[in-house]
Amino acid sequence: MILYPAIDLKDGNAVRLLRGEMSDATVFNTDPAAQARAFQDAGCDWLHLVDLNGAFAGEPVNGAAVEAILAATSVPTQLGGGIRDMATIEGWLTRGIARVILGTVAVEDPDLVRQAARAFPGQVAVGIDARKGRVATKGWAEETDVMVTDLARAFEDAGVAAIIYTDIDRDGAMGGPNVSATADLARATSIPVIASGGVSSLDDLHALKTTGVISGAISGRALYDGALDLSEALHALA
């Protein structure tokens, strides 16, 4: 199981939100590239980036910070937030992003996801963010009637590289991930599922890993707060 350290970008800073509320952001580092380098130096195999402003704006906003991170690191990086057309997808992949994460557009324009996955094999993931089993979009600001498993199954044969499943109510709350819901989703689809939201301890990582069906986990606040030591966590998962 791969551990993805998270860098959420807001106004050029590395921040964490509490339960997806932009008004409840804690700035952890004003130099995201330095933060990314620190994660790389600790031994991570991947980085997970989110352009929070971009998720709300519907287009990239923190591009300069993302490019600084790419210049400062060599590990593969996945990026989500405000990526809603082929030009943006191609632009980021050309600039060195290893995998783009499509969230809102997966609900609103699923054909674009299929088109992108065909054009860029292995480089397109779907981000499914949910409250109580229903998908939320536009930076979690809008809730839909779409069920998580239905959305995942819609891309079963599309060539999507991964599904990043975030339980919004767990995100940034340090209360542990929704292991059962994440495992249920992983069992419902053949697409690799990455857990996000609430991953805050070695016990959480162990619980996710022992399901045997979850391919990765994303952690942010716990790494910044020191509740989870990245080197120790990577060693535990090795």
From Swiss-Prot:
Presence of the UniProt keyword Metal-binding in the record: no
The reply to whether Isomerase figures as a keyword in the UniProt entry is yes
Spell out the reaction equation it catalyses.
1-(5-phospho-beta-D-ribosyl)-5-[(5-phospho-beta-D-ribosylamino)methylideneamino]imidazole-4-carboxamide = 5-[(5-phospho-1-deoxy-D-ribulos-1-ylimino)methylamino]-1-(5-phospho-beta-D-ribosyl)imidazole-4-carboxamide
What are the protein's UniProt keywords? Amino-acid biosynthesis, Cytoplasm, Histidine biosynthesis, Isomerase
Q: What is this protein called?
A: 1-(5-phosphoribosyl)-5-[(5-phosphoribosylamino)methylideneamino] imidazole-4-carboxamide isomerase
Q: What class of enzyme is it?
A: isomerase
**Family from the record:** Belongs to the HisA/HisF family.
Tell me, what is an example of a GO biological process annotation in this record?
Answer: L-tryptophan biosynthetic process
EC number(s) from the headed UniProt entry = 5.3.1.16
Q: Which GO terms describe its cellular component?
A: cytoplasm
The organism's lineage is: Bacteria, Pseudomonadati, Pseudomonadota, Alphaproteobacteria, Rhodobacterales
Q: Which cysteines are joined by disulfide bonds?
A: none
